[in-house]
């Protein structure tokens, strides 16, 4: 059938472990979906604030980045490295800069990606990415702090300052892809930024999602 041919799967009535859902509404809307089920407890497999691997994959897919080419991608809030890992798997030939201000996380990423020639790990403040030249990055894709765990961080100020720095390092027409639950703060920062404010009227500017049960949004912007 369609699912078997499209996804190269075999039917297993005893419990194949994969679920496909087809849902319809009375207003005519229909959706065909794959359920990304994880049987193990996520508390045991993920650190606090770590982005789940399947969500990181969806995030990267939504960014619509080329699968091949000598592009430069940056995750300035790389944390545990979920996004850089997916980028290295989905985009062959690119160079990925995974940076974070936390020295401990940077050390763990350096070990995790040891031997991965595509990923370069740096310790850096996302508002001062001094290792990048102006107009040198094709896409910044990141999951910055939302303010849930980092109570000492001024989130509105952080978002404003990071957008200024992203504007500096991105090439003309470069992409900015952000995941955040602090939606009001980010949208206000975009509104106040001369370069990125034009994006707020685009139909794909904002996509609402749930991350571990929390409301968030994925934002797609261009310089």
Language model regions located:
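Class I S-adenosyl-L-methionine-dependent methyltransferase catalytic core
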Residues: 2-223
